[in-house]
Amino acid sequence: MQDTNPSQPDSPITGYACIQDYLRNLSGAPGVYRMLDAQARVLYVGKARNLKARVSNYARPGHSPRIERMIRETASMMFLTTRTETEALLLEQNLIKQLKPKYNVLLRDDKSFPNILVAKDHSFAQIKKHRGAKKEKGTYFGPFASAGAVNRTLNQLQKAFLLRNCTDAVFESRTRPCLLYQIKRCSAPCVGLISDQDYAAAVKDAERFLSGRSTRVQEELAEQMMAASEAMEFERAAALRDRIRALTTVQGTQGINPRGVAEADVVALHLENGQACVQVFFIRANQNWGNRDFYPRVGEDVSAAEVMEAFLGQFYDNKEPPRQLILSDAIENADLMTEALSEKAGRKVELLVPQRGEKAELVSGALRNARESLARRMSESATQTKLLGGLAEAFDLDGPPQRIEVYDNSHIQGTNAVGGMIVAGPEGFLKNQYRKFNIRGDDLTPGDDFGMMKEVLTRRFTRLLKEDPDRDKGLWPDLLLIDGGAGQVSAVHEIMMAHGVQDIPMVGVAKGIDRDHGKEEFHRTGQRPFALKRNDPVLYFIQRLRDEAHRFAIGTHRAKRAKAVSATPLDDIPGVGAARKRALLAHFGSAKAVSRADLADLTAVEGVSAGLAQKIYDFFHES
């Protein structure tokens, strides 16, 4: 990859003239180009087999209104040459996600998806939910469309196969069965109530079920149930019946389970009125692991082929593609996309646009889902627009806010204090922009809510002024909502003045005298408190915003508290991370036992070198 930017034009020309000026020295190599406006903001990122030929297209008239606007705004360009067009495609999608150009199709929600992991770093395998890099030893099944889908499947698998989900440290410390054994969700291998061989057989059955051999597993359980019934072992027969029902429940929640599709993602696109919905169904081992809808940002005159190609490039930028992608719409550069995805996966990846048969039926079903999801979203968007207009009227704003930030704190008598910020706008809650703040102030009095809010807003505005001083990146709020009354509003106003931020409206939302929903009072600097009518839709909207901020802050606080509860002296030893901590606790059972271990015992733990063993030993034995 090489930066080959021709010298910028001397005069501040824009549009067609600017592009023609760059063409004079541009090479015919493959690569990526960027179009920038007069403020050097990236307008568009594109790839090309031949940069000179591709950019010359922009120098000729006859483009769509969207592209014409982009050309008029173009004041400069940047170029990167690559060895191959495939490399250019991968770089293009990476830059689009990073720079979020104004005129590109942009996938806005791009989280990783959870898997089920059968962890095999212990003699009794653990079954659990896993998200992120696949570094742990074991077998992975997925991806699943959501954490809820994983949790439901895990719940039923525990009923069917009685596998443990506890951590190794908890497993080693048990002296009697836990509650999961009592409710028939675990076979209690921790206290020896099942043999190694029987537990391994249960793990194997669970893996067979998740690998698509579910029918055979159920048939074997049914045979065992009949044999137990004939032997008049009715309690065992009933237990086997319940296990079969649990597996049937898993299959029932999966909807369609295609027989002729072993490993594929079904990707269906619906475009309407300048908006798009992409439905992705995840099919692995002939089983449907759920579906997710995505709403990429598109222009009013963009084609289905362009949206589909951009979606595939960005979606699989940080995910391993399956063996087949079954698409609703063909893309222009299908061969190039196939080559890029195959290179990423390290094996062949097929792109299919089926016209008949089972695969076409899958696409048809996904398209129906996409149409219905987009219709709901457009309806909700219209309602949201109306509510934002009502909010502007209620608080005397210049116009409907496009970005609302809501803040709340959570703590227990000042301990594990956190602040939470949620963001909402015309498209609803923008969860990928939520932020949490661990309260750092050592000089704060425990429970000082005013001081905590001051710290949170100080950090927020300090960062905003650093990252977006010109307010042109869409990071600044149009409205701040604070959970609290006059005192909170005064504290936040003080912070805003200190940072020179005087033009952002701020409202404190305080519960009324009886602290009841519907009796909220609203506080603004220099104004008397006021209320909205109990049946005002805007009031319900504000309550939803406040409750979401409260939920997020409490959830963050609970996670921090849980982490603090599980903290041990091992956390303070340099070189002992999460994996080595787990290994030490699994080997010794507790941090106290680790502190008593000698060097020979410590080096016997997997992943602990002689040098690290010495550090651990010295940590516990220094005077």
Swiss-Prot record:
Protein's UniProt keywords contain Transport: no
Give all residue intervals belonging to the GIY-YIG domain: 28-105
Q: Which InterPro entries match?
A: GIY-YIG_endonuc (IPR000305), GIY-YIG_endonuc_sf (IPR035901), GIY-YIG_UvrC_Cho (IPR047296), Hlx-hairpin-Hlx_DNA-bd_motif (IPR003583), RuvA_2-like (IPR010994), UVR_dom (IPR001943), UVR_dom_sf (IPR036876), UvrABC_protein_C (IPR050066)
- Name the UniProt key words of this record, in alphabetical order: Cytoplasm, DNA damage, DNA excision, DNA repair, Excision nuclease, SOS response
Query: What does the UniProt entry say about where the protein is found?
Result: Cytoplasm
Q: Which GO terms describe its cellular component?
A: cytoplasm; excinuclease repair complex
One GO biological process term: SOS response
Question: SUPFAM superfamilies per the record?
Answer: C-terminal UvrC-binding domain of UvrB, GIY-YIG endonuclease, RuvA domain 2-like
Tell me the subunit arrangement: Interacts with UvrB in an incision complex.
Kindly give the HAMAP family that the UniProt entry links to this protein: UvrC
Function per UniProt? The UvrABC repair system catalyzes the recognition and processing of DNA lesions. UvrC both incises the 5' and 3' sides of the lesion. The N-terminal half is responsible for the 3' incision and the C-terminal half is responsible for the 5' incision.
Q: What is this protein called?
A: UvrABC system protein C
